[in-house]
Amino acid sequence: LDAGMTLVDTADVYGLDWGGTGFGACEEALGRVLAADPSLRDRIVLATKGGIIPGVPYDSSAAYIVSACEASMRRMGVDHIELYQIHRHDFFTHPHEVAGAFAALHGRGLVSMFGVSNFSVTQTLALLAHVEVPLVTSQPEFSCAQLAPMRDGTLDLCMEEGLVPLAWSPLAGGRLATGEGIRPELVAVLD
């Protein structure tokens, strides 16, 4: 925080071991940190994501998104979230319904801004056509080992629509440090 990095980005699914335990664990841990030092809350931009349900796998229905956001807030012990993102596209929920969930959360003062994570360009455009509260972010996987957003139109869409691109896994899941699964010539350049 003292270096100016104030975005704290988490998700309800972070901490899940996919064996059925740990859902919400990272948000709970962050909640303990914020409870131990409440002054931190005013120094961070809090971002979280929802919409992944183990075994389903995705649910972006208005009822689920609203309840997932409220549950995230309880786990973190906060009364509002600056940025809430849909974690992955749900093919079975119409973008109009997602937009309605965003409007409801914003209208209640629970969330300031909204975005998407792991959405294609066309999925983002479909949601943009329905939102009342504008999207502000798109969060693709993006690193020097994963350059697809430069080629698939994601970064172009961000520029066109004024979305902030938030890279997830910018260090390629740690592989840039270890070299595992990375082309040797890229590792040589990074070293």
Label every model-predicted segment.
Residues 1-44:
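N-terminal binding-site loop/beta-alpha segment at the start of enzyme catalytic domains
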Residues 2, 31-45, 70-77, 104-106, ...:
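Acidic (Asp/Glu)-rich catalytic clusters
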Residues 8, 81, 114:
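Glycine-centered flexible beta-alpha turn that most often forms the glycine-rich phosphate-binding loop
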Residues 14-19, 53-58, 174-178:
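A short acidic, helix-capping loop that chelates divalent metal ions and anchors anionic groups
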Residues 42-54, 141-142:
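A short, structured active-site edge motif that brings together acidic residues
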Residues 50-66, 87-93:
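Active-site mouth loops of central-metabolism enzymes
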Residues 73-92:
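Active-site groove signature of glycoside hydrolases
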Residues 89-191:
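Beta/alpha (TIM)-barrel catalytic core signal, keyed to glycine-rich beta->alpha loops juxtaposed to Asp/Glu
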